[in-house]
Amino acid sequence: MILTTADTLGKREIIEYKGLVTGIIVRTPTITQGILGGLKNIIGGKNTSYTNVCKEARLHAEQEMINQAKELGANAIVAIRYDSSSLGGNTSGTEVFCYGTAVVVR
């Protein structure tokens, strides 16, 4: 599966547009990640616990989008965009949403 944030694929020709595909996931840190992340917030520095949660969430959302594209018979996704937001309240979760256009290229 070819993935790009660009609207075109250079020399490859888009021969069919299959439609919008999306991926969304909400991830919360484990208890250990939450404790380590909380300590890092106090002392400062790179917060690898939360960074890893965000990376994992992005990969899962992206995989969900890819699976949708495959179901449509696409072999590429163009114009991919990502968005994320943190959940407020008593949770420290992160929502990651991605979307793009599933296409067939040759």
UniProtKB/Swiss-Prot annotation:
One Pfam family of this chain: YbjQ_1
SUPFAM superfamilies for the chain: YbjQ-like
InterPro entries registered for this protein in UniProt: UPF0145_dom_sf, UPF0145_YbjQ-like
Ranges that cross the membrane: none
Family listed: Belongs to the UPF0145 family.
UniProt name for this protein: UPF0145 protein FTL_1249
Source organism: Francisella tularensis subsp. holarctica (strain LVS)
